[in-house]
Amino acid sequence: MAALDGLPPLRDVIQRHGLDAKKALGQNFLLDLNITQKVARTAGDLTNATVFEVGPGPGGLTRALLALGAKKVIAIERDSRCLPALAEISDHYPGRLEVIEGDALKTDFEAMAPDGPVKIVANLPYNVGTQLLINWLMPRQWPPFWDSLTLMFQKEVGQRIVAEADDDHYGRLGVLCGWRTEAHMAFDLSPQAFTPPPKVTSTVVHLTPRPAPIPCEIAKLEKLTQAAFGQRRKMLRASLKPLGGEALLNRAEIDPSRRAETLSVEEFCRIANLL
């Protein structure tokens, strides 16, 4: 991509700006520009799209998104050390990159979303990735402000996102994602793709909103899944006792001797709607 966008190699950028990845910020920089292009392509057609990126670091994925035609990239970066490197990219793509120094967990993405297609594409910091995903699944208005999420996670988290009933990885995250989105794992990334290499394999997950999820109140579904999977090895009559236990399950026509990991998303919604 150096030839494609005329910007220097990322290793030169991080050396020039003294950007060592900080463990406290969950940083692992993705420096292979072929891989960043692959991630950006997984998000689909970027033409006319505004893309939110979280934790751009030295800007490898940012460059790919812009080179592949994103109308605008809004990058949220907490680490002020990365801002000069991102400013160089902004100079190269005038008017197409907006960098906001701040904490993504405290950012109101919906308030910043313009009219037109909106995608969220990010190599998420490991320590906040799951919470950010849950935040993006939670807007009361649905379909949401975003058209797709293309996100990098530890592979174990990716497996939990796409898991369905009777899968060992199935849990609260799988229910919430399965309820409101269609999700699939696009491809894996070895630790060697990152600097410094993490101890685990990473994966890229692509999620699109279901146009009409099963009607259900978010708060009730969250409360139910927390109780059910908080004691996942117990029968539902025991794990859901504080919420109504056997009587609740009988009303929902669910066998009280079943365990949480056997319930489909539809069955979870059926119980939640009775709370």
Swiss-Prot record:
For the ligand (S-adenosyl-L-methionine), the binding residues are: 28, 30, 55, 77, 103, 123
* Gene3D superfamilies from the UniProt entry: Ribosomal RNA adenine dimethylase-like, domain 2, Vaccinia Virus protein VP39
Record's keyword terms, sorted: Cytoplasm, Methyltransferase, RNA-binding, rRNA processing, S-adenosyl-L-methionine, Transferase
| Keyword flag S-adenosyl-L-methionine | yes
The family database entries (SMART domains) matched by this protein are listed as: rADc
Q: Which Pfam families match?
A: RrnaAD
> What would you give as a GO molecular function for this chain, any one?
RNA binding
| Record's keyword annotation contains Transmembrane helix | no
Q: Which domain of life is it from?
A: Bacteria
Which Enzyme Commission number(s) are listed?
2.1.1.182
GO CC annotation, single: cytosol
Segments spanning the bilayer are none
PROSITE patterns in the cross-refs: RRNA_A_DIMETH, SAM_RNA_A_N6_MT
Q: Extract the CDD domains matched here.
A: AdoMet_MTases
Question: Where does it reside?
Answer: Cytoplasm
| Catalysed reaction equations from the record | adenosine(1518)/adenosine(1519) in 16S rRNA + 4 S-adenosyl-L-methionine = N(6)-dimethyladenosine(1518)/N(6)-dimethyladenosine(1519) in 16S rRNA + 4 S-adenosyl-L-homocysteine + 4 H(+)
Q: Family assignment? A: Belongs to the class I-like SAM-binding methyltransferase superfamily. rRNA adenine N(6)-methyltransferase family. RsmA subfamily.
The UniProt function text for this chain reads:
Specifically dimethylates two adjacent adenosines (A1518 and A1519) in the loop of a conserved hairpin near the 3'-end of 16S rRNA in the 30S particle. May play a critical role in biogenesis of 30S subunits.
Q: What is this protein called?
A: Ribosomal RNA small subunit methyltransferase A
- Organism of this sequence: Allorhizobium ampelinum (strain ATCC BAA-846 / DSM 112012 / S4)
Gene that encodes the chain? rsmA
